[in-house]
C-alpha cells in the first residue's frame, strides 16, 4: 500500500539500513518492528486527512497535533509535520535500535513517552460519531481499489497484535484476543464485499460510491481505535486497561448495526447496492468474483434459530462457501450469472430481515417475502441447485486425469464393508448403493478387456469409458464418506447418487453401442494375459562403443600401481551410465577386485546417502548404521577399503565439491584400486582425473544409430528389408543420441512389425524430436495403455537417481489401486507384469535382478524420464512433488483451486505446511532426504506436528513416512488407509489400531534408543483381516490366547517379518503366508512351536538353537519353500546337520551365515531344485566345505543344472601396511577390533605373527595403541580347516616393553618401511 510516497521512501530506506546490520539483539529487533508498525498506521491515518468526508466523520486532525509535538521539543516546527517525524523521531530510532545501551534506552523511553502522551490527548477527544454523512451527498473521491488496500493494511497490522504472545514485546496486548480476532473477521468480510461489488458493477452509480465510502469509514475508525489504544507497550505505563480496550471494540461492533447516515440504515446501504447489482447482472463483467468470502458475508450475519428454512439456508450457504474455495473459474464459466443471482438474493433476504427487524420486532419470513416480492421456499430450490452444482464441480476439478483401473475393485470391496459397518448412517442410501454395486460388478469384464486387450480396435473408446467409470468410482467413495461423516445434507447425497447411476447407464450404453464387450469378451475366457503382462527381459545393448570398452577395461586392470580415476563425461543421453555399468558388471573386471561398490550422486544429493550406499555394497545393509553421524560413516568406509583392492563407481557427479567430499574415503594403498566417475561437465571430469585423461563420449553416426535401434527392437534377429528404410528414417530422427534411440525403440517394439505401423511412428515423431528428449518421452507416454500411465507417472514420487526396491514399489501400486485384478493371478504377479512392460518399453532401467528367478529386484529412472514424470504428473493433477525450493505455497495452491491426488514430499516441514489444505489427497510419500540443519528439538516439533495433522488427510490410502519422521501416535481416523509405513516412538500400539480396518501393508519401525524392549501389539491387530504384509521388528502380543485363536484369521497375510515370539508352543500361521522372518526371543533359544504354513516360500531364522530333527519336521510342513536363510544358528552340542532325501523339494536358494556347524551330511537327492548355495560359516571344519562341493557336483553333473551357483566365503586374513616399528602395536589393535578375527599369536624367537580368522568386507578397523593390545596373546583353536597365515616380522623388538623399546630406539636410526601383504581368499563363485 503506497499512500504517501515520502513515507514509503523513508520506510524502505529504514528497512535497507536495518537489514544491512545482522547482529541485532532481541530488544533492538522488537523496537525496529514496533517502529515499522507505528509508521504503517501513521501512514494510513495521515492519508485519510485528504478525503472530503474526514471532518464530517469526526476524524481527528493528526497533522495539527504533530505541530504541538514539535513545540514541546523546543524545535522550530517545520513546514510539514511529517518532515519533523522523519528528522527527529525516525532518525533517533534508527540510531538507537542497532546497539541499545543505557543512553539509547533513555532516548527510546523518552520518544515512547512523548508518543504515548500525544495519543492520550487524541483519545480524550475521539469517540465514534453519531452522525457521519450528509443526506444524499455523493463522495466521488472514494476508489474501491484504495478501500481494499486500506483494509489490507489495517488487517496486516491487526494480525501482528494477534500473533505476539511475549509480554516483553512492545506489540503485546494483555488479556484474551477474541475481540481483535472478531474485528479482523469483520474487516475481511467487508473487503470481500467491496471486491465483489467492484468486480460486478458495470458503470458508476450513487449506491456503489456510497457503499465504498461507508466501507472506508468503518475501516478508518477501526484503524483509529487500534492506533490510539494499542499496543500498550509491554507491561509498563499501562494507562489503559485491557477491559477498556475490549469495551471500545464492543462499542465498535455495536456501532455496526446502528445508523451511520440520517434516514439510511447500514443495512439499507447493503440492500441498495445489492439491488443495483441485481439489475445489472445480465451485463456484468465475466469475472470470477464468487469467492468463498462473499458467500461468508451473508452467512456470517444469519441469526441462529430464525426458522427451519433459514437454518437450511445457512447450511447451504456454508456448503457453497466451503466448496467454492476448490473451484476454478473454467468450471463455472457458464454458471457465473446464476451464481451471482443466488448470492444477491440471499444477501437481500438476510439484510432485509435485519432492516425490517429494526423497525418491527415481530417480523416474520412471510413479511420479508411480501416486502421483497419473492417466495422463500421457491427461491431455495435454485440455491439448492447451485450448491449441488458447485459441490460436484469442486470435486471433479480435484480428480486426476490419470487413473488406475484397479480402483473399481477397491470400491466394490469398500462398499460391502461400509454397508456392514455403517448400516445406520447409510440406511437411506441402501437401495441406491446396491444398484451402484450391481452396475460396477457388471462393468468388471469390460475393465478386464481394457487391460488385457490394449490394442483392440476400439482402444480409444475403451480407455475413455474406463476412465469415466473410475471417475464415477471416486465419486461414489466420496459420497459414501460424506454420508458417514455427515458432511453433506441427505438431499444432496441422494441426488448425487441418482446422477451417478444415470451416468453409469449412459456409459454402458456407449459401450454396448460399439459392441466392444460382445466383440472382445469371447477372447477373454481363453486368454489369460496379453503380451502386456510380461515382456522378455531387455538387455542393455551397447553398439559403437566396443573399442572404448576394451580400452577402458585395460586401464582398469593395468596402468599405474596407485589409485586412479576414469572419468567419463558428455551431454545427457549419450550413455555414460550404461557404459560405466557395463564396465562395473564385467566379470573379467570384477574378478580382479576385492570390493566393488557404487553410488549415484545427482544434482541434489545427500552425503550420508552416498556413504550408506557405498557401505551397503561393501559390508552389507544395516539399519543401525543410518543413525551414525557422517564422519563416522566416512571413517568406516575408509577403513573398510584400506586393506583391499576396490572398484568404485560414482555416477552423475555435478560439481567438484562432491568429489572433494568423497575422495577422502578412498585410500590409496598402491594396489591398483580404481574409481569410475561419470559427469555431464568436462570441468568435473578433469578435476577428478589423476593419471588418465577424461573420456568424452561422442554421439552416434547414422549407421551406428540404426544398428542400435535395430538391436533394441529385434534383439538377435535381423530387421525385415521392408522395414529397413522407415527404420533408418526413425533412427535419423533421434538426433544420434543413444538415450533417444532407446526410448523410440520402445514404441515399435510393442507394435506389429508392419510398414504401416512404423510409418505411423515416424509421422507421429516428426522432425521435432531432434535434440528434444522430452518430445520422445511424450510420444512414448502417449502410446502407453491407460492402465500403465498411472504406474509410470507414480515414479515422480521418488528422488532422482535413487534405487527403487521393487517390493516396495509394487505394494505401493497395489495400495493405490493401479492394478486390475484377474482371476487366478495374484496382484503382485500382475504388477510385476506391468513393470516388465514398462521395462520392455525402455521407460524403466533395471539396476538389479534376483539371481534365483531373474525377477527385477531394484530399478530406477533416467533423469530425463523422471523430470517428465514430475511435470506431467502435476499437469494431470495426479501427483505434486513438493520440496524446499517450490515457490507455490499450500495456501496459494488451495486458492488456485487445485489439489492433487498424490503428494510427494522431500522434507518434513513441507508436510506440516500442506496438511491443512489437502483433504482430497489419496497418498502421501515422504522421500528419503536428510536435513542436518535441523536441531533435535525442531525434529521433535515436526514429529509432533505431523502426527497431529495426519487426520487432515482423511482420504489417504497410502501413507509412507518410512524416512525421517518418528510419529507420536498412529492416525486411527484414516479408515481408507491401505499402506502405512512409519517410525514410531511408542513401546506399545493402542487397541484402536483396529479402526484401521483397510490396511494391507503395515510397516512400523522404531528408533534405536527405544528398542530396548519388545513392541507390544494389541490383540486387535489379529482382527485386521485385510493385512497382507506385516513388518514390525521385535514385537510380541499382549494376549497369547487371542494370538493363538486369531492368527489363522489373517487369511490374506503373505508376509510376516521379524516377530519376537517368546513363549508360544503352538502357533497357527495364516494359510496363505508366503514370507516369514523370525528372530530369537531373549527367553527361549529354541523355536517353541512348529512352523506350519503350506504356502510358505521364504523363511529366515536368526539366532536360534536348531537340530536336524526340528529342521526335518519343519521341512515336512514346508513343501513349497523356495528360499531358506539361516543366520547365527547353532546346531546343538554335536554341531551336526543331517539332510535326508526329499527335504525341501522346491528349495532354490539356501543361504547359511555364521553357523556353528562341524558336520554337514547331505543326502544325494536332497535339495533337488537348488539353484544357489551361499555359505559363510564360523567354527566349521572341512566336512562342511566338502558337503557343499558335493551338492554342487550333484546339481551340475548329475542334474545338469548349469545355472547352479555356489558361493563359499572362507576364512580371510587381513592386509596391513606398516610404515615402521611403531605400527606393530597398532596392527595388534586393529586385528583385535575386527569382528572376524579368531586368533592372533606371536613367536618372538621365530619373529613371526600368525593371524587366523574371517576378515571380510564388514570388518571395522580402528587404530590406536594400548598396552593391552601390545601384550595380548590368544590361543589358536584346534579347528584345522582355518585359513591361517604366517606373517614374518623383521623387527626384533616384538614383545619388548615400552621402556626397552625407547632405549633401543635411541641407539639406532629408524628402520626402512616394512609392508605386510596378506592375500584375501574367498568370496567369488566356485
From Swiss-Prot:
SUPFAM superfamilies hit by this protein: P-loop containing nucleoside triphosphate hydrolases, RNI-like
Matching PROSITE patterns: HMA_2 (PS50846)
Listed GO biological process terms: plant-type hypersensitive response
Organism: Solanum demissum
Protein name as catalogued: Putative late blight resistance protein homolog R1B-19
Domain NB-ARC: 611-864
Pfam entry (one): NB-ARC
S-S bonds: none
One Gene Ontology CC term in the entry: membrane
Similarity remark: Belongs to the disease resistance NB-LRR family.
Main location: cytoplasm
Function: Confers resistance to late blight (Phytophthora infestans) races carrying the avirulence gene Avr1. Resistance proteins guard the plant against pathogens that contain an appropriate avirulence protein via an indirect interaction with this avirulence protein. That triggers a defense system including the hypersensitive response, which restricts the pathogen growth.
Residue ranges the record marks as coiled coil: 421-444, 536-558, 749-770
GO molecular function ontology, one term from the record: ADP binding
Amino acid at each position: 500500500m503506497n499512500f504517501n510516497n515520502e513515507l514509503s521512501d523513508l520506510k524502505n530506506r529504514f528497512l535497507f539500513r536495518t537489514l544491512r546490520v545482522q547482529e541485532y539483539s532481541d530488544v533492538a529487533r522488537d523496537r525496529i518492528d514496533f517502529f515499522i508498525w507505528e509508521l504503517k498506521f501513521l501512514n494510513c491515518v495521515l492519508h485519510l486527512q485528504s478525503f472530503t468526508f474526514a471532518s464530517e466523520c469526526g476524524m481527528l486532525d493528526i497533522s495539527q497535533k504533530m505541530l504541538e509535538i514539535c513545540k514541546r521539543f523546543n524545535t522550530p516546527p517545520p513546514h510539514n509535520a511529517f518532515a519533523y517525524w522523519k528528522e527527529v523521531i525516525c532518525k533517533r530510532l534508527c540510531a538507537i535500535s542497532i546497539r541499545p545501551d543505557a543512553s539509547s534506552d533513555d532516548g527510546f523511553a523518552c520518544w515512547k513517552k512523548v508518543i504515548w502522551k500525544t495519543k492520550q490527548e487524541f483519545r480524550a477527544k475521539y469517540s465514534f460519531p453519531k452522525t457521519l454523512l450528509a443526506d444524499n451527498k455523493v463522495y466521488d473521491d472514494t476508489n474501491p481499489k484504495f478501500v481494499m488496500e486500506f483494509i489490507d493494511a489495517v488487517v496486516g497490522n491487526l494480525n501482528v497484535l494477534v500473533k505476539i504472545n511475549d509480554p516483553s514485546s512492545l506489540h503485546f496486548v494483555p488479556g484474551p484476543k477474541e475481540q481483535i480476532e472478531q474485528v479482523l473477521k469483520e474487516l475481511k468480510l467487508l473487503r470481500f464485499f467491496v471486491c465483489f461489488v467492484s468486480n460486478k458493477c458495470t458503470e458508476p452509480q450513487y449506491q456503489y460510491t456510497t457503499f465504498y465510502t461507508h466501507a472506508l469509514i468503518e475501516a478508518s475508525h477501526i484503524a483509529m481505535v487500534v492506533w490510539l489504544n494499542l499496543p500498550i507497550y509491554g507491561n509498563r505505563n499501562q494507562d489503559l486497561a485491557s477491559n477498556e480496550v475490549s469495551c471500545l471494540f464492543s462499542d465498535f461492533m455495536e456501532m455496526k448495526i446502528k445508523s451511520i447516515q440520517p434516514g439510511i440504515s447500514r443495512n439499507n446501504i447493503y440492500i441498495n447496492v445489492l439491488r443495483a447489482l441485481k439489475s445489472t447482472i445480465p451485463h456484468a463483467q465475466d469475472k470470477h468474483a464468487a469467492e468463498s468470502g462473499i458467500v461468508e458475508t451473508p452467512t456470517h450475519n444469519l441469526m441462529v434459530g430464525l426458522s427451519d428454512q433459514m437454518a437450511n439456508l445457512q447450511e447451504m450457504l456454508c456448503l457453497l462457501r466451503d466448496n467454492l474455495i476448490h473451484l476454478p473459474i473454467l468450471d463455472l464459466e457458464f454458471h457465473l450469472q446464476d451464481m451471482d443471482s443466488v448470492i444477491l438474493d440471499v444477501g437481500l433476504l438476510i439484510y432485509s430481515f435485519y432492516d425490517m427487524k429494526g423497525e418491527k420486532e415481530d417480523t416474520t419470513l412471510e413479511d420479508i417475502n411480501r416486502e421483497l416480492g419473492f417466495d422463500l421456499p421457491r427461491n431455495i430450490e435454485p440455491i439448492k441447485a447451485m450448491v449441488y452444482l458447485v459441490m460436484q464441480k469442486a470435486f471433479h476439478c480435484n480428480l486426476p486425469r490419470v487413473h488406475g483401473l484397479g480402483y473399481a475393485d477397491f470400491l466394490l470391496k469398500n462398499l460391502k464393508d461400509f454397508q456392514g459397518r455403517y448400516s445406520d448412517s447409510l440406511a437411506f442410501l441402501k437401495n441406491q448403493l446396491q444398484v451402484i454395486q450391481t452396475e460396477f460388478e457388471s462393468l468388471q469384464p469390460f475393465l478386464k478387456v481394457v487391460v488385457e486387450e490394449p490394442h483392440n480396435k476400439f482402444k480409444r473408446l475403451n480407455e475413455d469409458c474406463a476412465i469415466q467409470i473410475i471417475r464415477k468410482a471416486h465419486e461414489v467413495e466420496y459420497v459414501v464418506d460424506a454420508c458417514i461423516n455427515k458432511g453433506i445434507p441427505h438431499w444432496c447425497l441422494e441426488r448425487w447418487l441418482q446422477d451417478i447411476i444415470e451416468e453409469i447407464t449412459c456409459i454402458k450404453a456407449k459401450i454396448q453401442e460399439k459392441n466392444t464387450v460382445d466383440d472382445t469378451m469371447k477372447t477373454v475366457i481363453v486368454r489369460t494375459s496379453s503380451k502386456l503382462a510380461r515382456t522378455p527381459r531387455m538387455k542393455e545393448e551397447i553398439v559403437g562403443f566396443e573399442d572404448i570398452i576394451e580400452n577402458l577395461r585395460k586401464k582398469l586392470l593395468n596402468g599405474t600401481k596407485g589409485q586412479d580415476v576414469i572419468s567419463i563425461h558428455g551431454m545427457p543421453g549419450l550413455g555414460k551410465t550404461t557404459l560405466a555399468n557395463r564396465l562395473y558388471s564385467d566379470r573379467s573386471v570384477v574378478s580382479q577386485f576385492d570390493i566393488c561398490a557404487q553410488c549415484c550422486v545427482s544434482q541434489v544429493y545427500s552425503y550420508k546417502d552416498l556413504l550408506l550406499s557405498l557401505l551397503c555394497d561393501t559390508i552389507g545393509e544395516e539399519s543401525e548404521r543410518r543413525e551414525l553421524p557422517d564422519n563416522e560413516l566416512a571413517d568406516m568406509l575408509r577403513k573398510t577399503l584400506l586393506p583391499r583392492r576396490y572398484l568404485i563407481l560414482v555416477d552423475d557427479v555435478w560439481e567438484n565439491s562432491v568429489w572433494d567430499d568423497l575422495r577422502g574415503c578412498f585410500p590409496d594403498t598402491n594396489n591398483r584400486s580404481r574409481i569410475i566417475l561419470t559427469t555431464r561437465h568436462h570441468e568435473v571430469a578433469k578435476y577428478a582425473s589423476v593419471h588418465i585423461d577424461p573420456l568424452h563420449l561422442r554421439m552416434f553416426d547414422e549407421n551406428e544409430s540404426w544398428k542400435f535401434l535395430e538391436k533394441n527392437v529385434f534383439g538377435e534377429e535381423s530387421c525385415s528389408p521392408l522395414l529397413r528404410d522407415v527404420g533408418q528414417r526413425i533412427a535419423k530422427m533421434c538426433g544420434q543420441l543413444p538415450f533417444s534411440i532407446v526410448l523410440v525403440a520402445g514404441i515399435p517394439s510393442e507394435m506389429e512389425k508392419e510398414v504401416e505401423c512404423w510409418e505411423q511412428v515416424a509421422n507421429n515423431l516428426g522432425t521435432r524430436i531432434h535434440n528434444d528428449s522430452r518430445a520422445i518421452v511424450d510420444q512414448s507416454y502417449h502410446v502407453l495403455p491407460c492402465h500403465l500411465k498411472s504406474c509410470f507417472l507414480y515414479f515422480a514420487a521418488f528422488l532422482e537417481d535413487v534405487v527403487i526396491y521393487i517390493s516396495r514399489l509394487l505394494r505401493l501400486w497395489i495400495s493405490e489401486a493401479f492394478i486390475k485384478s484377474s482371476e487366478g493371478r495374484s496382484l503382485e504377479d500382475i504388477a510385476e507384469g506391468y513393470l516388465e512392460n514398462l521395462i520392455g518399453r525402455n521407460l524403466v532401467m533395471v539396476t538389479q535382478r534376483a539371481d534365483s528367478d531373474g525377477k527385477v529386484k531394484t530399478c530406477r529412472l533416467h533423469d530425463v524420464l523422471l523430470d517428465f514424470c514430475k511435470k506431467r504428473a502435476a499437469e494431470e493433477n495426479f501427483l505434486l512433488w513438493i520440496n524446499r525450493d517450490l515457490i507455490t505455497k499450500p495456501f496459494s495452491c488451495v486458492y488456485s483451486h487445485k489439489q492433487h491426488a498424490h503428494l510427494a514430499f522431500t522434507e518434513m516441514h513441507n508436510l506440516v505446511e500442506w496438511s491443512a489444505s489437502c483433504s482430497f489427497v489419496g497418498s502421501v510419500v515422504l522421500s528419503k532426504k536428510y536435513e542436518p540443519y535441523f536441531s533435535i528439538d525442531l525434529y521433535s516439533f515436526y514429529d509432533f506436528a505431523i502426527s497431529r495433522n495426519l487426520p487432515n488427510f482423511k482420504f489417504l490410502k497410502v501413507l509412507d513416512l518410512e524416512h525421517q519422521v518418528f510419529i507420536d501416535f498412529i492416525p486411527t481416523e484414516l479408515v481408507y488407509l491401505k499402506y502405512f509405513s512409519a517410525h514410531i516412538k511408542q513401546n506399545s500400539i493402542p487397541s484402536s489400531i483396529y479402526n484401521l480396518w483397510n490396511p494391507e501393508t503395515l510397516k512400523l519401525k522404531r528408533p534405536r534408543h527405544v528398542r530396548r524392549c519388545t513392541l507390544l501389539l494389541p490383540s486387535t491387530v489379529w482382527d485386521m483381516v485385510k493385512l497382507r504384509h506385516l513388518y514390525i521388528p521385535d514385537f510380541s502380543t499382549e494376549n497369547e490366547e487371542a494370538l493363538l485363536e486369531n492368527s489363522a484369521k489373517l487369511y490374506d497375510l503373505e508376509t510376516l517379518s521379524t516377530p519376537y515370539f517368546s513363549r508360544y508352543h503352538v502357533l497357527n500361521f495364516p494359510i496363505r503366508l508366503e514370507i516369514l522372518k523370525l528372530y530369537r526371543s531373549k527367553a527361549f533359544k529354541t523355536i517353541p512351536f512348529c512352523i506350519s504354513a503350506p504356502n510358505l516360500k521364504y523363511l529366515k531364522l536368526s539366532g536360534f538353537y536348531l537340530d536336524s530333527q526340528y529342521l526335518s519336521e519343519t521341512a515336512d510342513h514346508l513343501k513349497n519353500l523356495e528360499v531358506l536363510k539361516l543366520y547365527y544358528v547353532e546346531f546343538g552340542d554335536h554341531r551336526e546337520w543331517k539332510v535326508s532325501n526329499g527335504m525341501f523339494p522346491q528349495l532354490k536358494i539356501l543361504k547359511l551365515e555364521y553357523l556353528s556347524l562341524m558336520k554337514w551330511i547331505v543326502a544325494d537327492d536332497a535339495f533337488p531344485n537348488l539353484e544357489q548355495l551361499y555359505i559363510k560359516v564360523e567354527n566349521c571344519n572341512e566336512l562342511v566345505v566338502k558337503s557343499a562341493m558335493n551338492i554342487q557336483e550333484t546339481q551340475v553333473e548329475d542334474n545338469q543344472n548349469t545355472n547352479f551357483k555356489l558361493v563359499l566365503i572362507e576364512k580371510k586374513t587381513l592386509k596391513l601396511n606398516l610404515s615402521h616399528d611403531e605400527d606393530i602395536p597398532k596392527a595388534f589393535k586393529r586385528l583385535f577390533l575386527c569382528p572376524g578375527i579368531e586368533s592372533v599369536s606371536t613367536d618372538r624367537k621365530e619373529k613371526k605373527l600368525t593371524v587366523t580368522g574371517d576378515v571380510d568386507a564388514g570388518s571395522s578397523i580402528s587404530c590406536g595403541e594400548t598396552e593391552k593390545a601390545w601384550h595380548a596373546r590368544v590361543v589358536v583353536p584346534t579347528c584345522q580347516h582355518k585359513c591361517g597365515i604366517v606373517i614374518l616380522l623383521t623387527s626384533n623388538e616384538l614383545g619388548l616393553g615400552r621402556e626397552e623399546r625407547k632405549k633401543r630406539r635411541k641407539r639406532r636410526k629408524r628402520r626402512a618401511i616394512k609392508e605386510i601383504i596378506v592375500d584375501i581368499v574367498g568370496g567369488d563363485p566356485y
